[in-house]
């Protein structure tokens, strides 16, 4: 997106939600275009491409950091603005389609961004995004995002998710009270495969370990409870 569009969406969302230091957030929403960020892949530092799935991971990382800073009474404007930048950029598809074929096109990308800069921010998208204030719902919505090709859909998606991110950081629902029950059930579930080793002998230990790890990864209730707990813990 053009800087004009980033700032337009970010300012509209921050004003609608009465966010403090809103202009600092607005200015930070263009930082990723000024300062490259990197992730590590196969031992190498690779620049985060704003229209790749790594942009969503970068956005989520900044969202988590912004929430922590807010809980600690510190300024979260920079991380919040950078998160919104990645969310907004990823909503723009950079591909062209013809029949069943699809390919990346810089020309299409540039044309879409030029035209987006002339669109108004959809107020109904802000209202829709404000309905999401649960961190687990935000995470699901964020990582379910798909790049859009139609201009109105791009603007709507970018605005909705931007509003959801801001609302969840500043006005979250929940309190993390289900954490203790979730962790108790999780420990019991992860430990249960060890019964194989106790009953069948130590030769079963490797399989029991693998099963325990699988149970840990697939215990979605535990991971949701953990995110909610962490959301309210400085």
Label the model's feature ranges:
Residues 76-88:
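Short alpha-helix carrying the canonical HExxH Zn2+-binding catalytic motif
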Residues 173-226:
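Transmembrane alpha-helices
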């Amino acid at each position: 997106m053009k800087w004009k569009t980033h700032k337009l969406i970010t300012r509209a969302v921050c004003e609608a939600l009465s966010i403090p230091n809103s202009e600092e957030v607005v200015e930070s929403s263009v930082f990723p275009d000024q300062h490259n960020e990197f992730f590590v892949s196969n031992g190498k530092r690779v620049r985060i491409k704003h229209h790749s799935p790594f942009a969503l991971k970068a956005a989520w990382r900044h969202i988590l950091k912004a929430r922590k800073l807010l809980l600690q009474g510190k300024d979260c404007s920079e991380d919040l603005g950078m998160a919104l930048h990645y969310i907004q950029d990823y909503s723009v598809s950079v591909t062209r389609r013809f029949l069943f074929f699809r390919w990346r096109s810089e020309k299409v990308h540039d044309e879409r961004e030029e035209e987006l800069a002339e669109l108004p921010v959809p107020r109904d998208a802000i209202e829709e995004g404000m309905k999401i204030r649960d961190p687990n719902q935000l995470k699901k919505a964020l990582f379910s995002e798909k790049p859009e090709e139609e201009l109105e859909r791009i603007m709507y998606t970018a605005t909705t998710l931007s509003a959801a991110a801001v609302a969840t950081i500043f006005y979250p629902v929940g309190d993390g009270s289900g954490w203790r029950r979730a962790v108790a059930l999780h420990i019991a579930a992860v430990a249960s495969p060890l019964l194989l080793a106790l009953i069948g002998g130590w030769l079963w230990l490797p399989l029991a370990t693998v099963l325990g790890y699988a149970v840990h990864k697939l215990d979605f209730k535990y991971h949701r409870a953990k995110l909610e707990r962490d959301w309210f813990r400085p």
